[in-house]
Amino acid sequence: MDPEETSVYLDYYYATSPNPDIRETHSHVPYTSVFLPVFYTAVFLTGVLGNLVLMGALHFKPGSRRLIDIFIINLAASDFIFLVTLPLWVDKEASLGLWRTGSFLCKGSSYMISVNMHCSVFLLTCMSVDRYLAIVCPVVSRKFRRTDCAYVVCASIWFISCLLGLPTLLSRELTLIDDKPYCAEKKATPLKLIWSLVALIFTFFVPLLNIVTCYCCIARKLCAHYQQSGRHNKKLKKSIKIILIVVAAFLVSWLPFNTFKLLAIVSGLQERYFPSAMLQLGMEVSGPLAFANSCVNPFIYYIFDSYIRRAIVHCLCPCLKNYDFGSSTETSDSHLTKALSTFIHAEDFTRRRKRSVSL
């Protein structure tokens, strides 16, 4: 097969396709053959353990389950499925891009990465919408924020993500270049580039805009609530801090690589091309950040969500009485939702009184 019939920029696993136009440098080889295998091994070990503990803690915890926990469990499951394929990519990077595990795993692992990417973005979007409904529209959200609705939404996300991953499954193949096996993508046609551009916009940038918008509205509502109630010191700072960290982690993990991917697709559709070396370097540097997102989520939840922290400690050390759940399963979210509901009812009551007086 002609090396020029491979593409380097249509996947979320940046360097899975060889690019014969870019020569290896002395600094590039240690990065791909030494740093990346070590980095991916660390991501694999911490991510598998962290997501297993997170799923077990939330699934087997005593008491009722929060609605947000359903999305978190599915997100952890998606990350875990992806992380299982990481040893294949460790071997690939250690062997300087050679794929030594056969065609089935070439297609299957690439498909799992695509499904994980879509599933993660959609679940994070649903979690932001859930927080938005719970905090900004607590009264109206009671009709939609139900357990059965959450399960239906998660099942739909998995189904849609599996469908969106099919183009990757069909386009990946094990090809020989200079008698060496590579897990590569077939040549990108103009139609495929257009599809990739549309898919990237609607499966990443639109959800990203949704997430940022939801959390901005949440922050605005929290500021208004705490200023009105007179409690705007520690609680306000903590709530805003968690929101900013969640948004920042998402942006740092996904935005750099998808930006380079967007530039690469646009470059392929236009006569003027961006320097291929620049795009390759950008994807090689930003790609591991997207991979690492699958292992950092459990740590973010453990550090910043006291409810999940108690669940994990209770799961690992049931004998610790200080972390017992007790009879109450309410969290800061539920307390805040109740407070905002009361606040909204009070606003409505005041508004109606003013209207009746004016009449």
From Swiss-Prot:
TM ranges:
34-54, 70-90, 121-141, 150-170, 193-213, 240-260, 284-304
- Name the UniProt key words of this record, in alphabetical order: Cell membrane, G-protein coupled receptor, Membrane, Phosphoprotein, Receptor, Transducer, Transmembrane, Transmembrane helix
**One GO term of the cellular component aspect?**
external side of plasma membrane
This entry's Gene Ontology molecular function terms read:
C-C chemokine binding; C-C chemokine receptor activity
Q: What is its main location?
A: membrane
Offer one example of a GO biological process linked to this entry: angiogenesis
Query: Which cysteines link up through disulfide bonds?
Result: none
Q: Which branch of life, at top level?
A: Eukaryota
Q: What is this protein called?
A: G-protein coupled receptor 15
Species this chain originates from? Macaca fascicularis
